[in-house]
């Protein structure tokens, strides 16, 4: 199944890709933002940007199993998971990223990131988290034994909200627009 959230909706759609059909939905508070699946815990995690929380969805009954606070990360947008270390990374629009234990929901730490973050991406090979903020900064974090630490920021074109990581090459791909033109650029990780 594929779990799909729609901005400002009040449910997460569960889609059967073989039938290309919504088979059920999970009721949630308004304004979902990012959804990720953890294959180790077999849970779906959904940020709720109108509240500082991450919803935990059990895909068996397709119901909310828990609600975890993301405070101090307010307006959580970007969300990523490291299944190997059982860590969930939730990035708030207010410039805070909180690390949660993906089994218990316990907060493991917080780190400052650029304000206005939208999407984040995790590279499992080098254990880095990349946080795209539209004002021209990409925050780079390193997962550590304790939680995460900041490695600094990389300048990006204004409006860079979208990114993806190639876990084979460790390149970070960003997308942005200038006027009516759209661009994609590759950033090489060091």
Residue spans of the language-model regions?
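Predominantly soluble domains enriched in secretory-pathway, periplasmic, or organellar proteins
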Residues: 1-190
